[in-house]
Swiss-Prot record:
Entry protein name: Putative pentatricopeptide repeat-containing protein At1g77010, mitochondrial
Keywords attached to this entry: Mitochondrion, Repeat, Transit peptide
Single Gene Ontology BP annotation: RNA modification
Record gene name: PCMP-E5
Family: Belongs to the PPR family. PCMP-E subfamily.
Source species, domain of life: Eukaryota
Cell compartments where the protein resides: Mitochondrion
GO molecular function list: RNA binding
Annotated organism of origin: Arabidopsis thaliana
UniProt-listed InterPro entries: E_motif (IPR046848), Pentatricopeptide_rpt (IPR002885), PPR_At4g14850-like_plant (IPR046960), TPR-like_helical_dom_sf (IPR011990)
Residue stretch of the organelle transit peptide: 1-64
Annotated region described as Type E motif, given as residue ranges: 621-695
Length: 695
């Protein structure tokens, strides 16, 4: 009868009606509380609370008090719930569990655990609340300690802990726990463990779980079949993935997404796109899989085109934006990246940690570190991922002290945090700091991976310390990373910078070369040792091997042409970069070409290239032209170059001296004197040269 009243007035009348009754009517009060809860009426909760207190039902009827306690707990009003709990003379499992769960859901994990410890007796639900709560919050050591303390472990709590491990990136630990306990697993357990197999690409383990499902007669629902599709697809067994997909009467988007990603990860992009196109009314998950598949296969332009198509059908999410921003990074499309920043603000995704971190990375790698710093100052919440990204940003613009300060702010420093520091120091030429931090990692017994090893070897290469670099590589051999592509590429760089190009080439010839990184290292090695023709020959072999060059590849091969004066080869490569490979040359490519042309005496062509360049010209390019003019006796163009340098960099003493010399050699002593006078008036001084000799 009570639940038929809809208006607040009638509802209150119903409580007044009950108030007038003199009989014990606990079931009506329970229904009254349920009705209050369903309508989310806080005023009536309080009125009902007062009524129950007045009538003495809170002390005499536990079930009534528990329902009121649950209402306050679920609405996050834990202060009121605590007062009510303290007033209850009798409490049962439900009372304690409600408080434990309420505090856990409100983020007060410590208080929740204190209530759990005070609880006279605990049931399975009590254990599950604290274990799952700490697991979801990422405090896995606490969750595992509680799980180990359970007198009787149950499959529900096990599932919560397994899910927590996978959710927080510890899939390997989830598998280890599953194997250790040897539980009688239910469908949820097996589905969860299959997720771990997919994350780790553990095909053998996935097949074992599949066999266990078949032998045990476990009913395969759509979720379990989807998980099996995901395992086989991620592990590259596309035949089995397709077979499992056929077993699903109505495949969900997660299953299709897994297979689309599987085809893409194996380089079968056309089949991936065919599967994608067969589906109508595609959800964001499918779009994300296809966009990510294009990016994984270095088809970043296709990814951007597909993103534009997506916007006509559905709205992007944080994963979409992160993928598209990564495509912008690969293509060097700063303006498109800025548009993605606007999208993130427009759709409320800017506070997503992954999106913010990717934007920071984009601004840093696309030459706008100040924009990254501005974004970082506007971000309201941080996590380790975002702080690690900011460390890289600060290192990219040489703000080493700021990078150190951010590193100190990270409470739980991960291997990625330490690697960000060693890599940043190495890139900024801080060899001593690189070695110090690597030594600290060793003292803390942190694992050594390819990133830390390659950073330290690169630091050794920067000071041409072959002996120290080989000692670090010996460490790589001990931990089984001597064949790693990144580590081997660093070793090539070490040998070449120490002048042992043949040693570097031997490493290159014997290693696996799946991407452009080792090719870039070897081409750069030839360039720094003045072997331009060898660098160009290796660049051609790279194309024959099916490895697509990047902008960095073109930078190192153009540098080789510059060092060796290979003008015609440089022209062809610069043109091929634009026409054949679709790259837009950046400032560094233009600068290298200008220096190449000016050195070889093609000063007028170099000036034309500078004036046609779609970037703001800095003094360094005009300095290259000025050196070319002085070397080849082009006084008129040298005068123009020197004047441009003085205009852009008024404190550049070299430009004044060279301009004065140009006037003097042409007999215009008056103009030469005026330049010297202007130099003095602007307080520009030239530091005297000096040399050191061993005695």
């Amino acid at each position: 009868m009570i639940l038929k009243y809809n208006s607040s007035y009638r509802f209150y009348l119903s409580s007044s009606f009950l108030q007038a009754m003199e009989v014990d009517c606990r079931r009506y009060y329970v229904r009254l509380l349920q009705s209050c809860s369903s309508r989310n009426r806080e005023t009536l909760w309080r009125q009902t609370n007062g009524l129950l207190l007045k009538k003495g039902f809170l002390s005499s009827i536990v079930i009534v008090a528990n329902h009121l306690l649950q209402m306050y707990s679920r609405s996050g009003k834990m202060g009121i719930a605590r007062n009510l709990f303290d007033e209850m003379p009798d409490r049962n499992y439900f009372s304690w569990n409600t408080m434990i769960e309420g505090y856990m859901n409100s983020g007060e994990k410590g208080t929740s655990l204190r209530f759990f410890d005070m609880m006279p007796e605990r049931d399975g639900y009590s254990w599950n609340v604290v274990v799952s709560g700490f697991a979801k919050a990422g405090e896995l050591s606490v969750a595992r300690r509680l799980f180990n303390a359970m007198p009787e472990k149950d499959v529900v709590t096990l599932n919560s802990l397994l899910h927590g491990y996978i959710l927080n990136g510890y899939a390997e630990e989830a598998l280890r726990l599953f194997k250790e306990l040897n539980f009688s697993a239910d469908a949820i357990t097996l589905t969860t463990v299959l997720k771990a197999c997919a994350e780790l690409e553990a095909l053998k383990c996935g097949k074992q779980i599949h066999a266990q499902i078949l032998i045990g007669g476990v009913e395969c629902d759509s979720k379990m079949n989807s998980s099996l599709v995901n395992v086989y697809a991620k592990c590259g067994d596309l035949r089995m993935a397709s077979y499992m997909l056929e077993q699903i009467r109505e495949p969900d988007d997660h299953s299709l997404s897994a297979l689309i990603s599987g085809y893409a990860n194996c380089g079968r992009v056309n089949e991936s796109r065919g599967l994608f196109d067969r589906k109508s009314n595609r959800c964001v998950i499918l779009w994300n899989s296809m966009i990510s598949g294009y990016i994984a296969n270095n088809m970043k332009m296709e990814a951007l085109v597909l993103f534009n198509e997506m916007r006509n059908e559905t709205r992007e999410d944080s994963r979409t934006l992160a993928a598209v921003i990564n495509a912008c990074i690969g293509l060097g499309f700063l303006e498109t990246g800025k548009q993605m920043h606007c999208h993130a603000c427009k759709f409320g995704l800017i506070d997503d940690i992954v999106v913010a971190s990717t934007l920071l990375d984009m601004y840093s790698k696309c030459g706008s570190p100040m924009e990254a710093c501005k974004l970082f100052s506007e971000v309201e919440s941080y996590d380790t991922i975002l702080l690690n990204s900011m460390i890289k940003v600060y290192f990219s613009c040489g703000r080493i002290d700021d990078a150190k300060r951010v590193f100190e702010r990270i409470e739980n420093k991960s291997l990625i945090s330490w690697n960000s520091m060693t890599n940043g120091f190495s890139q900024n030429g801080c060899t001593v700091e690189t070695l110090e931090y690597f030594h600290q990692m060793h003292k803390l017994d942190l694992p050594t991976d390819e990133v830390s090893l390659s950073s330290v070897i690169s630091a050794c290469a920067s000071i041409s310390s072959l002996e120290l670099g080989e000692q670090v590589f010996a460490r790589a051999t001990i931990v089984g990373l001597d064949s790693d592509q990144v580590v081997s590429s660093s070793l090539i760089d070490l040998y070449c910078k120490c002048g042992f190009v043949e040693h570097g080439r031997r490493v290159f010839d014997t290693m696996v070369k799946s991407d452009e990184v080792p090719w870039n290292s070897m081409i750069s090695g030839y360039a720094t040792n003045g072997q331009g023709f060898e660098a160009i020959d290796l660049f051609k072999k790279m194309s024959v091997a099916g490895i697509r060059p990047t902008q960095i590849t073109f930078m190192v091969v153009l540098t080789a042409c510059n060092y060796c004066g290979l003008v015609e080869e440089g022209r062809k490569l610069f043109e091929s970069m634009k026409v054949d490979h679709g790259f837009v040359p950046d400032k560094e490519h233009f600068s290298c070409m200008v220096d190449l042309l000016a050195r070889a005496g093609y000063v007028e062509e170099a000036i034309n290239l500078v004036e046609e360049m779609p970037f703001d010209v800095d003094g360094s390019m005009w300095s290259s032209i000025l050196r070319g003019c002085v070397a080849n006796g082009y006084k008129a163009m040298g005068k123009k170059a020197a004047e441009k340098i003085i205009e852009l960099e008024p404190e550049n003493s070299v430009a004044y001296v060279q301009l004065s010399a140009i006037f003097a050699t042409s007999g215009d002593w008056e103009s030469s004197a005026l330049v010297r006078k202007l130099m003095r008036e602007n307080n520009v001084t030239k530091n005297p040269g000096s040399s050191w000799t061993d005695c």
